[in-house]
């Protein structure tokens, strides 16, 4: 997830064509997110929705034995056709393949490591060859396996999302698809042991971050939308925060925007390391990002860093913990330190390169001082207790309150926000009509090397 600065398993549709022979068998604000909808599109027809990818914890494999009417020759030479009418032969046989826990694939509890990279500074070169440091790192920090487990869940969930999401799906369908997959792979509902690390960000176009649908949201993904997909997975409070951007247009007009942001994020990852100054990372990211431009409708737009959005370090059960990683040169001489975990994320925009909060809020989290807050009504106190017991200090959204059985809670929720017990994170947007993109990775600063734990074949 981003931090703002100011006040698949592929879901496969298998079509098997049978003939008469049998065929073989994603100011300084903290980036949790929401924004007003740039376009409220009409929902698709019910018939279309019925054919969309299922959004529950199972994936649907559709086998379509289309028994084509074929001519066979009788012994007398006259043709005969199959007895069943063609329409009846096109029935779809739906089989549900259940997603199993990630633990079943790794029964020994040892999960794939991420991408290892050397530290950039020469003064750290001794770290790479230190066998003792690597041994002590493994002995001290067995929580690395929690990060690797979360990262493997993340890779599988995003592969499923990338292969399943299509224009015409509602944002709620997309959010359910992703979040139910996380719950299934983690073998946990929204619990404090494992599962969803923060609400799934599905911000469109000029909305850079913090949008996820609330109940009743009818917004539909369009073919010309640019969608940032920000997914969080945690295991025992160790959060993997990684994001990517999806486009669906036929003429690939957004390619340079995505290329700029992806390269900028990889630059930030490459420059990060123990004793590296945060300003130096921001300067390197800015140089790469702002070397790009893109053309839309015959007009050329420079691609700008969104200067009041940042990466951040990650704490246990805390998505934004202290340090911020700028994506422009900002003079911050703070250094990264051994053992820290960072989300390196960058945002590019064709707009102003600056975001402001707008629209209906969906993202929330307990404030650091929530225990000292003076909460007035009994209903607000009860809601606070529900939030604390279900989510702790992890971010959450209104849909999660619905899921745990809360009803008619908006008044009490607003009271908690006003009392300072809960922090709200509305959507943050650039100039109307602009386009924004995001890529993000989680990195672990081991004593000897850094591990890009969320790295995959896709980005």
Swiss-Prot record:
Localization: Cytoplasm
Reaction it catalyzes: Release of N-terminal amino acids, preferentially methionine, from peptides and arylamides
Region listing for Disordered, in residue ranges: 63-101
Pfam families: Peptidase_M24 (PF00557)
Cofactor requirement: Co(2+); Zn(2+); Mn(2+); Fe(2+)
Record note on cofactor: Binds 2 divalent metal cations per subunit. Has a high-affinity and a low affinity metal-binding site. The true nature of the physiological cofactor is under debate. The enzyme is active with cobalt, zinc, manganese or divalent iron ions. Most likely, methionine aminopeptidases function as mononuclear Fe(2+)-metalloproteases under physiological conditions, and the catalytically relevant metal-binding site has been assigned to the histidine-containing high-affinity site.
Keyword Ubl conjugation in record: no
Residues engaged in binding a divalent metal cation 2: 241, 312, 345, 440
Recorded GO CC terms: cytoplasm
Any one GO molecular-function label of the UniProt entry: initiator methionyl aminopeptidase activity
Binding site for substrate: 210, 320
EC number: 3.4.11.18
InterPro entries per record: Creatinase/aminopeptidase-like (IPR036005), Met_Aminopeptidase_Type2 (IPR050247), Pept_M24 (IPR000994), Pept_M24_MAP (IPR001714), Pept_M24A_MAP2 (IPR002468), Pept_M24A_MAP2_BS (IPR018349), WH-like_DNA-bd_sf (IPR036388), WH_DNA-bd_sf (IPR036390)
Record's compositionally biased regions (Basic residues): 88-99
Assigned keywords, A-Z: Aminopeptidase, Cytoplasm, Hydrolase, Metal-binding, Protease
Chain sites annotated for binding a divalent metal cation 1: 230, 241, 440
Keyword Cell division in annotation: no
Coiled coil: none
Biased composition (Polar residues): 63-81
Function: Cotranslationally removes the N-terminal methionine from nascent proteins. The N-terminal methionine is often cleaved when the second residue in the primary sequence is small and uncharged (Met-Ala-, Cys, Gly, Pro, Ser, Thr, or Val).
HAMAP family, A to Z: MetAP_2_euk (MF_03175)
NCBIfam families cross-referenced by the UniProt entry: met_pdase_II
Protein name: Methionine aminopeptidase 2
Organism: Meyerozyma guilliermondii (strain ATCC 6260 / CBS 566 / DSM 6381 / JCM 1539 / NBRC 10279 / NRRL Y-324)
Gene this protein is translated from: MAP2
